[in-house]
């Protein structure tokens, strides 16, 4: 285990004195109607949470955690789930909240929830009863906030959730293909909370309850607010000067020609004089009370290099131990982003997950099936955060790089609660995991490094020597969990970070011997160095080593088990040749992927910055810095996706065209080393039939002989018709 962290909160999450309404006690379910409020004896709600998801009282759903957390502090909390956004009426169903509205789009970004990576409308929604689509609007955070303001203009609105969190600064919006302002500006909300919200939510709620106004609360970590100028007492630095070196002292001459000559006189010893010692106060750390001024919204919208620069700065200011505040101008005001909150301790995590969740959907949904709940109802979240730092993923920016783990006892208690109380439990726990399966209790072994490090990833390009890779706590947890009475099987469904796992083969043996149901998901994402370097993913050497150990331990356990690798197509940095090599690798290893994913440019991700700007924010940004190859356009993105499904006959014509254009005709045919078969006679006939009705596009620059050939061919086919 690592030493005691230097990153400590000012106070414990549960140290606040309870609000007076604690006398009502916890509600069976947080109320969604006035009738439920009446049954609880409430005349009003102190806080109302508005969400784009169905209300499931389970710790995998953000609104359940936030609601139960606030309830434990003594507040009366109501839920408005998936309201009708066409008018303000549905937002008034619980009356006027005494303190504030909390608004979130839900567990997913509403645009990703509603649209595919090809910008096509989805026809389902896993967070809605019976999987019905269309129960939340586009950009739900904006719409819900506007309706809350229409309903009660004088009630503060606080934004939260993944959608608001990843849009806290000016950001590239894939769906409109433009740079948009911070969601705080567009929504006109009073405050935005990014990342995990327990600490800021509890502090702001108590301070509002004690009489402060929302405008007076400006210093809470993990929050963003609108200001006209920097906060008093803070000093700033322009982001464009952070990489500029300071004054450099001249190097002294090694032979001392410029030194004064000696006069050969005896030197009298100096008398030692007593000096008063002045005790200086401790110097403030360089990141305390310091903010970075990012390029303004107007500048990053008009200059892609400045956009990439701003993104790079933001990603380096995510360590709660040393992060500085950020300030970005929007028009005549600024978005002020306070440093990230201090991670929860193990004791605080245990308390959050011990709150009185019912672990089922609200009774108002009756027998309706909620797919997202069905997926996780027998799974357990054992930790938060991820130090992988993958460029295409926003977990690190949302949950942080420091792993926040629950205690073994807390997890065992939850397994027993599922066994004893959740309807339909058959003895199988579907997952013990989190963002990554095998980062439980892993953290930096050096408290000083943990506090001051600004690395984007603790495992790329190599695993940091300070990072703990001992999987003993995870192994002990697995062993204790599967010994529980009534538990038949503990499965691991979260993705395994295989480059960490190979550092402790005992974990792979434990996993393969007891916790795999035939298939194990891992995510190499690609095989080629070009895209892997932009994704910040390890090379295939780690994958090969993991597969070797996994196959060995599966065989020793007498089990036939397989790895299911996940890959991303059309990621920035990927050339057509890279995708061909990946397809050849898949064929060589006899993989036929059914579900494949094109890169989806989500807000705030480093990969999205590459997609939009063509620059690499993983290194220093400049107008002459590295350019990144970006697969854009529907045809190229379709080609990259088709190459992942090289075995699908529907993709063969497109793949053949690409191979011919790349000069790789030798990969077309029936030989073992070929990627796709040659076209059949029927396919060639069909191609000729399709070309029969086409005409050459002739211009005045077309050579005369070609014009005559084209006219003759047209007359022969159409007998001169259509001229």
Swiss-Prot record:
Keywords associated with the record: 4Fe-4S, Iron, Iron-sulfur, Metal-binding, S-adenosyl-L-methionine
Sequence segments annotated as region (Disordered): 686-723
Cofactor section: [4Fe-4S] cluster
UniProt xrefs under Pfam families: DUF3362, Radical_SAM, Radical_SAM_N
Cofactor descriptive note: Binds 1 [4Fe-4S] cluster. The cluster is coordinated with 3 cysteines and an exchangeable S-adenosyl-L-methionine.
Family under the similarity heading: Belongs to the UPF0313 family.
SMART domains noted in UniProt: Elp3
One GO MF term attached to the UniProt entry: iron ion binding
Protein name from the UniProt record: UPF0313 protein YgiQ
UniProt keyword Iron-sulfur present: yes
Composition-biased stretches (Basic residues): 714-723
Domain Radical SAM core span(s) in chain numbering: 372-650
SUPFAM superfamilies per record: Radical SAM enzymes
Binding locations of [4Fe-4S] cluster: 386, 390, 393
């Amino acid at each position: 285990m690592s030493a005691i962290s230097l990153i400590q909160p000012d106070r414990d999450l549960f140290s606040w004195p309870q609000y007076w309404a604690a006398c009502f006690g916890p509600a069976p379910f947080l109320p969604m109607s006035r009738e439920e409020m009446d049954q609880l004896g409430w005349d009003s709600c102190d806080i109302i949470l508005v969400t784009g998801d169905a209300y499931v009282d389970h710790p995998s759903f953000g609104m359940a955690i936030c609601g139960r957390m606030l309830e434990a502090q003594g507040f009366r909390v109501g839920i408005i789930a998936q309201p009708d956004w066409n008018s303000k009426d549905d937002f008034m169903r619980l009356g006027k909240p005494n303190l504030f509205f909390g608004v979130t789009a839900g567990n997913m970004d509403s645009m990703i929830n509603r649209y595919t990576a090809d910008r096509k409308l989805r026809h389902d929604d896993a967070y809605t009863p019976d999987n019905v689509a269309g129960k939340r609007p586009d950009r739900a955070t904006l719409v819900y906030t506007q309706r809350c303001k229409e309903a009660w203009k004088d009630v503060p609105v606080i934004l939260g959730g993944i959608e608001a969190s990843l849009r806290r600064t000016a950001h590239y919006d894939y769906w409109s293909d433009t740079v948009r302002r911070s969601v705080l500006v567009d929504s006109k909300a009073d405050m935005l909370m990014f990342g995990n919200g327990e600490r800021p939510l509890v502090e702001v709620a108590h301070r509002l309850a004690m009489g402060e106004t929302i405008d007076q609360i400006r210093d809470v970590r993990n929050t963003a607010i609108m200001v006209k100028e920097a906060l008093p007492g803070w000093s700033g630095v322009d982001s464009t000067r952070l990489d500029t070196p300071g004054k450099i002292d001249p190097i002294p001459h090694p032979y001392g020609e410029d030194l004064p000559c000696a006069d050969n006189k005896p030197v009298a010893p100096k008398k030692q004089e007593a000096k008063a010692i002045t005790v200086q106060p401790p110097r403030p750390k360089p990141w305390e009370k310091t903010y970075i001024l990012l390029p303004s919204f107007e500048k990053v919208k008009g200059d892609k290099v400045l956009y990439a620069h701003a993104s790079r700065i933001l990603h380096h200011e995510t360590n709660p131990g040393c992060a500085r505040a950020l300030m970005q101008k929007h028009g005549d005001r600024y978005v002020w982003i306070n440093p990230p909150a201090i991670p929860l301790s193990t004791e605080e995590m245990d308390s959050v997950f011990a709150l009185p969740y019912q672990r089922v959907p609200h009774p108002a949904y009756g027998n309706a099936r909620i797919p997202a709940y069905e997926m996780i109802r027998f799974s357990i979240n054992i930790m938060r955060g991820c130090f992988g730092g993958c460029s295409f993923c926003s977990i690190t920016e949302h949950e942080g790089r420091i792993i926040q783990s629950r205690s073994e006892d807390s997890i065992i208690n939850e397994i027993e609660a599922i066994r004893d109380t959740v309807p339909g439990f058959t003895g199988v726990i579907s997952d013990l995991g989190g963002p990554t399966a095998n980062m439980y209790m892993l953290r930096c072994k050096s408290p000083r490094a943990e506090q001051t490090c600004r690395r984007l990833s603790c495992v790329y390009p190599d695993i940091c020597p300070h990072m703990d890779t001992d999987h003993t706590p995870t192994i002990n947890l697995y062993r204790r969990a599967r010994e529980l009475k009534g538990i038949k099987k503990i499965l691991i469904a979260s993705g395994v970070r295989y480059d960490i796992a190979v550092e402790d083969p005992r974990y792979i043996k434990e996993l393969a011997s007891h916790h795999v149901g035939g298939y194990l998901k891992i995510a190499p994402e690609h095989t080629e160095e070009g895209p892997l370097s932009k994704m910040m993913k390890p090379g295939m050497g780690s994958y090969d080593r993991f597969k070797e150990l996994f196959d060995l331990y599966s065989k020793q356990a007498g089990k036939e088990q397989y790895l299911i690798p996940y890959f991303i197509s059309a990621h920035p940095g990927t050339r057509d040749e890279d995708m061909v090599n990946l397809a050849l690798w898949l064929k060589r290893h006899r993989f036929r992927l059914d579900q494949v994913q094109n890169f989806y440019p989500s807000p705030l991700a480093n990969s999205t910055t590459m997609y939009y700007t063509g620059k690499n924010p993983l290194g220093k940004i400049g107008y002459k810095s590295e350019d990144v190859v970006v697969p854009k356009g529907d045809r190229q993105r379709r080609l990259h996706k088709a190459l992942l499904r090289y075995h699908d006959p529907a993709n063969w014509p497109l793949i053949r065209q690409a191979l011919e254009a790349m000069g790789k005709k030798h990969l077309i045919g029936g030989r073992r080393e070929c990627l796709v078969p040659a076209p059949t006679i029927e396919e060639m006939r069909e191609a000729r039939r399709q070309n029969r009705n086409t005409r050459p596009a002739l211009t005045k620059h077309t050579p005369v002989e070609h014009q005559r050939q084209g006219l003759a061919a047209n007359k022969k086919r159409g007998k001169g018709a259509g001229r």
